[in-house]
């Protein structure tokens, strides 16, 4: 697409960043001074009843700056990147038609990528094929299936851990249904996003600062009742650790503690470590991201001014 046709597209803003980087606070500040509406880009914030451990904006924050695509699924339900793209495009169109600018804020980089570049034409899930894979796993173990994937699609096998049955079975399922590997199919992109996107990433200047923020926030969550929140989910009886919701960072570790698998101190240690690992993955995505402007989360006022310098002109 040339620059002239790109300039005629509606505007959108991406505000990306690792967990605990201050994205939400900045987005709320920006909404006070720009004609923007916020859309959450977070695979954990979609779940109802999961507020503390996901650092969901509180009632006052949501009153000041409503977020779309929050609380749209029960923790028992799945939600894919394709679901997100469909929902986000609908919300963006609604915001644009009202004469405002969509501001997409979050840290689920796969969702941002799916929205920006479109999705690969992957086949839909097939319950029969999935059942066959699960039966094989029950007989041979997931390690054997991982070796099978290694022969079929070594690139995907290198990315997928043998202890990740959901992604492992999906990679095999795609091959059994289509005859093509996940790697082959994901190299074919779908439709690009029909918006002129201004992309920002916010993060502390150093990894140590981010690690401190993560640890502090995890302890704040515990003080705010995170254990009680997860116990309420556990008490439902229909949730388990194979669900994406319960595999969310912090929830998986708290679940292990509630089940008596680990001690409280071990839960805290693992929860902080898992959150740091998540932040590391998010930063790896962002460092390879094209066309992004970096903001320093330790200087929120300056970050806000930098966004306004770029976006102020398009918002007029």
Curated annotation (Swiss-Prot):
GO molecular function, one term: tRNA dimethylallyltransferase activity
E.C. designation(s): 2.5.1.75
Reaction catalysed by this enzyme: adenosine(37) in tRNA + dimethylallyl diphosphate = N(6)-dimethylallyladenosine(37) in tRNA + diphosphate
BP terms from Gene Ontology: tRNA modification
Keyword vocabulary terms for this entry: ATP-binding, Magnesium, Nucleotide-binding, Transferase, tRNA processing
Annotated InterPro entries: Dimethylallyltransferase, IPT, P-loop_NTPase
Binding site for ATP: 17-24
Positions of region (Interaction with substrate tRNA): 42-45, 166-170, 247-252
Site location (Interaction with substrate tRNA): 108, 130
Chain residues that bind substrate: 19-24
Co-factor requirement: Mg(2+)
Pfam family for this entry, one: IPPT
Top-level EC class: transferase
Family membership: Belongs to the IPP transferase family.
Oligomeric and partner information: Monomer.
Primary role: Catalyzes the transfer of a dimethylallyl group onto the adenine at position 37 in tRNAs that read codons beginning with uridine, leading to the formation of N6-(dimethylallyl)adenosine (i(6)A).
Protein name: tRNA dimethylallyltransferase
């Amino acid at each position: 697409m040339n620059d002239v046709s790109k300039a005629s597209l509606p505007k959108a803003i991406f505000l990306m960043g690792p967990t605990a980087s201050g994205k939400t606070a900045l987005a709320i500040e920006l909404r006070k001074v720009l004609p923007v509406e916020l859309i959450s880009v977070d695979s954990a914030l979609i779940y109802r009843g999961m507020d503390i451990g996901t650092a969901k904006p509180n009632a006052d924050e949501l009153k000041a700056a409503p977020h779309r695509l929050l609380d749209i699924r029960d923790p028992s339900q799945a939600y894919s990147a394709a679901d997100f793209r469909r929902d986000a495009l609908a919300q963006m169109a609604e915001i644009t038609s009202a004469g405002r600018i969509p501001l997409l804020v979050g840290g689920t980089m796969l969702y941002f990528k799916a929205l920006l570049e479109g999705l690969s034409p992957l086949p839909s899930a097939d319950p029969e094929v999935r059942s066959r894979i699960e039966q094989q796993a029950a007989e041979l173990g997931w390690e054997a299936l991982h070796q099978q994937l290694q022969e079929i699609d070594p690139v995907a096998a290198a990315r997928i851990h043998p202890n990740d049955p959901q992604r492992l079975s999906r990679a095999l399922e795609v091959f059994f249904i289509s005859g093509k590997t996940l790697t082959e199919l994901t190299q074919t992109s779908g439709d690009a996003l029909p918006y002129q996107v201004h992309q920002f990433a916010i993060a502390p200047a150093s990894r140590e600062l981010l690690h401190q923020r993560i640890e502090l926030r995890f302890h704040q969550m515990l003080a705010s009742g995170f254990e009680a929140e997860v116990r309420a989910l556990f008490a439902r009886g229909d949730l388990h650790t194979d669900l994406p919701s319960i595999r969310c960072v912090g929830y998986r570790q708290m679940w292990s503690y509630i089940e008596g698998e680990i001690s409280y101190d071990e839960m805290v240690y693992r929860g902080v470590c898992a959150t740091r690992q998540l932040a590391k993955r998010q930063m790896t995505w962002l460092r390879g991201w094209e066309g992004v402007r970096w903001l320093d989360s330790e200087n929120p006022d300056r970050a806000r001014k930098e966004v306004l310098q770029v976006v102020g002109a398009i918002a007029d």
